[in-house]
């Protein structure tokens, strides 16, 4: 779907009115071609990547803070019965972007004196004795050494045969827990594991005395989110009606399948629409439904200090190497870094240092990127999990839009050198 320049400017004006900025005057000063260039980038992504990545729609939000511009653009259709064009009310599964909401919930509890992130799993969840030494901080920065339940054959088989299965948190954790009949490789250094976030969810519920859903609802309200929802399982019809079709297209084997592996445990799901999949398999690790507009609001609120106090935000942005798990001051080109469920990266062609996260479920991808040096937040979402090695959403869309903004002097010229 094409979105004409005048329509894009009008949409930006509506968004800006709520944010207190005046995008159209800024856009006019840069020439009328900027909206068309951004729209063309989305159209090109769909045209070039539709068959490769299995996508049919994309939603982009660009927020340069006060005074703007705020730009929103969409392309493609939702794939539902009426095949309606994607618009500002369309919703996506945002996958592991759920994790930084969860980290914020933990840190808010710390600020309230209800827990300390240097307390251990053993302190809060003594039933998991094998991991009793692991600190909450290590759960959130992925240095716990705990295997990933979502890559196990046991969980994969259930997901492949019953998309509506209601997982309990204990069922997910048990798939990764060491036993004589369940020996998984014990990762060292930094290792990405969804099990960390299921454990953190249990700690949140125990420390707060509330369900994770209720804790998240308070966070959503504090950040001013209107289109963000969490259900540990089946979503209400009113929410699902706004979620577009999302396809599973990735034939790659699960990490813990026996080698050699010819067919993925999840192969029965290939080509299927994952829109109505029960998201209890993801829970606190990845079950939020939202859209790029609300995710940008969240990122602004989080980094603006409106979600957790400054001390806790400093803890959240304290980094370890994604290669070694050891503390680092900042990311470099060869060594991305991880905070408490946040990623910092350095790429010269993407403006130097920036914060980001890419969330992914079996049918959706959603990325946020935040450049403090430009006061720029970009969020984008699309509707597939593509074959391994084919995902070009971030580079194709965010990279091109960043260059468009720089060429239009909306942001400063992009540096070509920096910390490496």
State where each predicted segment sits.
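Boundary at the C-terminal end of the N-terminal hydrophobic targeting segment
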Residues: 26-29
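Short, gly/Ser/Thr-rich active-site loops of penicillin-recognizing serine hydrolases
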Residues: 324-326, 385-420
């Amino acid at each position: 779907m094409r979105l004409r320049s005048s329509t894009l400017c009008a949409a930006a004006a509506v968004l800006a009115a709520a944010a207190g900025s005046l995008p159209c005057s800024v856009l006019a000063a840069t020439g009328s071609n900027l909206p068309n260039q951004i729209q063309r980038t989305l159209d090109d992504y769909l045209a070039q990547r539709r068959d490769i990545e299995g996508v049919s729609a994309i939603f982009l939000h660009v927020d340069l803070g006060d005074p703007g511009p705020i730009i929103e653009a969409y392309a493609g259709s939702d794939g539902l019965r009426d095949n309606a064009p994607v618009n500002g009310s369309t919703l996506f599964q945002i996958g592991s972007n759920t994790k930084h909401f969860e980290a914020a919930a933990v840190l808010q509890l710390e600020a309230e004196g209800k827990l300390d992130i240097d307390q251990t799993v053993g302190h809060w969840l003594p039933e998991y004795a094998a991991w009793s030494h692991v600190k909450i901080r290590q759960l959130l920065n992925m240095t716990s050494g705990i295997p990933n339940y979502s890559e196990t054959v046991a969980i994969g088989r259930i997901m492949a045969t019953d998309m509506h299965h209601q997982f309990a948190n204990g069922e997910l954790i048990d798939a990764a827990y060491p036993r004589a009949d369940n020996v998984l490789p014990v990762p060292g250094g930094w290792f990405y594991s969804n099990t960390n976030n299921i454990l953190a969810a249990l700690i949140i519920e125990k420390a707060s005395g509330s369900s994770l859903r209720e804790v998240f609802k308070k966070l959503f309200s504090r950040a001013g989110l209107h289109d963000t929802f969490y259900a540990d399982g089946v979503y209400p019809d009113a929410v699902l009606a706004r979620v577009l079709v999302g396809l599973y297209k990735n034939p790659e084997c699960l990490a813990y399948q026996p080698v050699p592996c010819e067919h993925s445990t999840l192969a029965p799901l290939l080509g299927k629409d994952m829109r109505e999949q029960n998201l209890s398999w993801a829970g606190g690790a990845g079950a939020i439904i939202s859209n790029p507009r609300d995710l940008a609001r969240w990122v602004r609120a989080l980094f603006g200090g409106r979600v957790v106090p400054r001390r806790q935000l400093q803890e959240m942005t304290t980094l370890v190497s994604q290669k070694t798990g050891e503390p680092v001051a900042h990311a470099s080109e060869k060594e991305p870094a991880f905070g408490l469920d946040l990623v910092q990266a350095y790429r010269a062609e993407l403006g130097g240092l920036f914060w980001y996260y890419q969330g992914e479920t079996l049918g959706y991808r959603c990325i946020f990127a935040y450049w403090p040096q430009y006061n720029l937040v970009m969020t984008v979402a699309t509707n597939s999990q593509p074959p391994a090695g084919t995902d070009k959403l971030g580079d194709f869309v965010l990279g091109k839009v960043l260059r468009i903004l720089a060429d239009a002097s909306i942001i400063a010229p992009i540096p070509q050198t920096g910390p490496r």
